[in-house]
C-alpha cells in the first residue's frame, strides 16, 4: 500500500493514488491538474520516508473533480429568561481532488489495476 501525507489548506491529509479527497477550497478550475509539493511523508514498498519538514523530490499529482459546499452547521446562542436568541448557519466550501500519482525517487506510484473477476462455469 502506497500513501503520502500532504499539507494543503493548513491541514494534513493522508492520500492514496486512485482515491478522491475533499480539501479546503482551491482557486483552480474543474478538471485542472495540480501538484502538491508539501509532502510530509511517503510510504511505499521499500519503507517510509519522513520529511524534515518535507520530503525532498516528492510530489503528489492530482486533478480537480468539483467544487462544493459541505453540510450546513447551525450555531444557536441563547440567554435563558432574557429573550436573547441568535441563530446562524455556515456551509464550508471545499474542493474534491482525485489523486492520480505519487512521485518519489524517480518512480511514479499510481493506483493498482483491479483484478478482473474470473467466472467459473
UniProtKB/Swiss-Prot annotation:
<dbReference type="GO" id="GO:0019843">
    <property type="term" value="F:rRNA binding"/>
</dbReference>
<dbReference type="GO" id="GO:0003735">
    <property type="term" value="F:structural constituent of ribosome"/>
</dbReference>
<dbReference type="GO" id="GO:0005840">
    <property type="term" value="C:ribosome"/>
</dbReference>
<dbReference type="GO" id="GO:1990904">
    <property type="term" value="C:ribonucleoprotein complex"/>
</dbReference>
<comment type="subunit">
    <text>Part of the 50S ribosomal subunit. Contacts protein L20.</text>
</comment>
<dbReference type="Pfam" id="PF00829">
    <property type="entry name" value="Ribosomal_L21p"/>
</dbReference>
<comment type="function">
    <text>This protein binds to 23S rRNA in the presence of protein L20.</text>
</comment>
<comment type="similarity">
    <text>Belongs to the bacterial ribosomal protein bL21 family.</text>
</comment>
<keyword id="KW-0687">Ribonucleoprotein</keyword>
<dbReference type="GO" id="GO:0006412">
    <property type="term" value="P:translation"/>
</dbReference>
<dbReference type="InterPro" id="IPR001787">
    <property type="entry name" value="Ribosomal_bL21"/>
</dbReference>
<protein>
    <recommendedName>
        <fullName>Large ribosomal subunit protein bL21</fullName>
    </recommendedName>
</protein>
<dbReference type="GO" id="GO:0005737">
    <property type="term" value="C:cytoplasm"/>
</dbReference>
<dbReference type="InterPro" id="IPR018258">
    <property type="entry name" value="Ribosomal_bL21_CS"/>
</dbReference>
<keyword id="KW-0689">Ribosomal protein</keyword>
<keyword id="KW-0694">RNA-binding</keyword>
<dbReference type="InterPro" id="IPR028909">
    <property type="entry name" value="bL21-like"/>
</dbReference>
<dbReference type="InterPro" id="IPR036164">
    <property type="entry name" value="bL21-like_sf"/>
</dbReference>
<keyword id="KW-0699">rRNA-binding</keyword>
Amino acid at each position: 500500500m502506497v500513501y503520502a501525507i500532504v499539507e494543503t489548506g493548513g491541514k494534513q491529509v493522508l492520500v492514496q493514488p486512485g482515491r478522491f479527497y475533499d480539501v479546503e477550497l482551491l482557486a483552480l478550475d474543474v478538471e485542472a491538474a495540480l501538484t502538491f509539493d508539501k509532502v510530509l511523508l511517503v510510504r511505499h514498498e521499500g519503507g517510509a520516508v519522513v520529511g524534515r519538514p518535507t520530503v525532498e523530490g516528492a510530489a503528489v499529482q492530482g486533478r480537480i473533480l468539483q467544487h462544493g459546499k459541505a453540510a450546513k452547521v447551525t450555531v444557536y446562542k441563547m440567554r435563558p429568561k432574557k429573550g436573547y436568541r441568535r441563530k446562524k448557519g455556515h456551509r464550508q466550501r471545499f474542493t474534491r481532488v482525485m489523486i492520480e500519482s505519487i512521485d518519489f525517487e524517480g518512480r511514479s506510484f499510481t493506483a493498482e489495476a483491479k483484478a478482473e473477476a474470473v467466472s467459473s462455469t
